UniProtKB/Swiss-Prot annotation:
PANTHER family: DNA-DIRECTED RNA POLYMERASE I,II,III, DNA-DIRECTED RNA POLYMERASE II SUBUNIT RPB11. This is DNA-directed RNA polymerase II subunit rpb11. GO terms for cellular component: RNA polymerase II, core complex. It comes from the Eukaryota. It comes from Dictyostelium discoideum (Social amoeba). Component of the RNA polymerase II (Pol II) complex consisting of 12 subunits. Its main location: nucleus. Pfam families: RNA_pol_L_2 (PF13656). GO terms for biological process: transcription by RNA polymerase II.
Length: 120
């Protein structure tokens, strides 16, 4: 078959950067971030987190082609900040949310195990 190997969907080629940023020359305070080997899951998470930021004027993402697992995220900010700072702030916030979710999940699993152990 002509299908690519599955590992090609998530393994970065040698020397490739996971994230690149290109400033938009036509729109002030705008940049395009390209994230390699990711899909709609990451694109939508980042976009939704960026939209929650008061300094963001526009945040959107797209996948250039369905067979390429790359996400382009376009961001425009107001004059109070720049796109890179907003992305960094959003990533930190998402990281805290994921840590909280993981801790909550582990706590609930332990509670469930303790209840199950009572009946054994």
């Amino acid at each position: 078959m002509n299908a690519p190997d599955r590992f090609e969907l998530f393994v970065l080629p040698d020397g490739a950067k996971k994230v690149t940023m290109v400033r938009d020359t036509k729109i002030p305070n705008a940049s395009m971030f390209t994230i390699l080997k990711e899909d709609h899951t990451i694109g939508n998470l980042i976009r939704m987190q960026l939209i929650a930021d008061q300094d963001i004027i526009f945040a959107g993402y797209r996948m250039p082609h369905p067979l390429e697992h790359n996400v382009n995220i376009r961001i425009q900010t107001n004059n109070n900040t720049n796109p890179l700072e907003c992305v960094q702030k959003s990533m930190e916030c998402l990281s805290r949310e994921f840590t909280s979710l993981e801790n909550s999940f582990i706590e609930q699993v332990q509670k469930k195990r303790n209840v199950a152990d009572q009946y054994i």
